[in-house]
């Protein structure tokens, strides 16, 4: 096989591997104590991560004790929001939400997957086989 064909084949396999969307744990925005983690496929431009939502102290929160709970849960996070802090208001309560991202499929759960995606494994194996045949 000529080197141009090898390059095209390798590029196609690598493109397929990189085009895969991440699989992440998600709680559907629910608090961590009621989370039934499900595995979802994140959208284009999203990564696995965690959301940490904490209320900011105020006099209104003293009247609403349930609003003083902090929440930590896994979710898909837009890549451009990774490692950012946002201030959000819900009714009379103001929350600080920190969005942290991690790398790899299912990296935001208690049991993370360390298996190599099949497309990458196939690309490396094919390239090694093609190069050894020359």
Curated annotation (Swiss-Prot):
The keyword Cytoplasm does not apply. Residues 22-121 form the UPAR/Ly6 domain. It is found in: Cell membrane. Residues 109-134 form a propeptide. Glycans are attached at residue 68. Disulfide bonds join 24-48, 27-35, 42-76, 82-101, 102-107. Keywords: Cell membrane, Disulfide bond, Glycoprotein, GPI-anchor, Lipoprotein, Membrane, Signal. One of its GO terms (cellular component) is protein-containing complex. O-glycosylated. Its main location: membrane. One of its GO terms (molecular function) is identical protein binding. The keyword Transmembrane does not apply. GO terms for biological process: acetylcholine receptor signaling pathway. A lipid is attached at residue 108 (GPI-anchor amidated asparagine). InterPro entries: LY6_UPA_recep-like, LY6G6d/LY6G6f, Snake_toxin-like_sf. It is a lipid-anchor; GPI-anchor. Residues 1-19 form the signal peptide. Homodimer. This is Lymphocyte antigen 6 complex locus protein G6d. It comes from Rattus norvegicus (Rat).
